């Protein structure tokens, strides 16, 4: 009786070790950063804001002086107008290993529908989408899939004066 229990526990332990070994390989280095980025873009398209927020690092900081909470609210402000559909397409141009992180650079295309402001937002965003975005990702824990977004860079996007992330009255300013 004890021997069969020991064999079952040993088999379970081997399965768990194999699972984590495989996941470590699948989510390591550049592959892991690209995989995390792909999930993030898919969550944006699906308007799953809480999933996006969980992928943003507590230490998030960017050129617009946004922190984790600010960028989460700004994404919601943007997406609030696309309640019928939102499609975010990403084409990776390069992936670069940096000290302790990975930079995923690429082009983004946005389509969608919803409120009357949605068409206006897409029209206003098009000139900015010509330039590439850079997303900086780093591993944040012991789990192989624990990648977090640390920074978003873009050469020409500016935050309009008076824009406050999460303030619905100012969400159309951007």
Residue locations for each model-derived region?
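Short, low-complexity N-terminal intrinsically disordered segments enriched in polar/charged residues
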Residues: 2-49, 54-58, 70, 77
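Residues that act as N-cap/strand-start positions at coil-to-secondary-structure junctions
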Residues: 36, 87-89, 129-131
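Charge-dense, low-complexity intrinsically disordered segments
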Residues: 27, 62-65, 124
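Short solvent-exposed beta->alpha transition segments
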Residues: 50-114
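Solvent-exposed, well-ordered amphipathic alpha-helical segments
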Residues: 2, 90, 135-139
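Exposed beta-sheet edge and beta->alpha loop/turn motif
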Residues: 97-174
């Amino acid at each position: 009786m004890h021997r069969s229990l020991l064999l079952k526990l040993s088999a379970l332990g081997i399965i768990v070790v194999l699972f984590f070994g495989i996941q470590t390989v699948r989510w390591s280095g550049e592959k892991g950063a690209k995989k995390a980025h792909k999930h993030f873009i898919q969550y944006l398209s699906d308007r799953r804001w809480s999933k996006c927020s969980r992928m943003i690092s507590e230490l998030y900081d960017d050129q617009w002086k946004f922190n984790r909470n600010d960028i989460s609210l700004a994404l919601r402000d943007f997406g609030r107008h696309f309640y019928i559909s939102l499609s975010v397409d990403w084409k990776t141009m390069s992936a670069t290993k940096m000290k302790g992180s990975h930079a995923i650079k690429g082009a983004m295309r946005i389509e969608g529908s919803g409120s009357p402001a949605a068409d206006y937002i897409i029209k206003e965003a098009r000139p900015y989408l010509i330039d590439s975005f850079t997303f900086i990702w780093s591993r944040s824990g012991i789990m192989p899939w624990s990648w977090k977004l640390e920074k978003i860079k873009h050469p020409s996007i500016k935050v309009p004066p008076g824009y406050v992330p999460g303030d619905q009255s100012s969400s159309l300013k951007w």
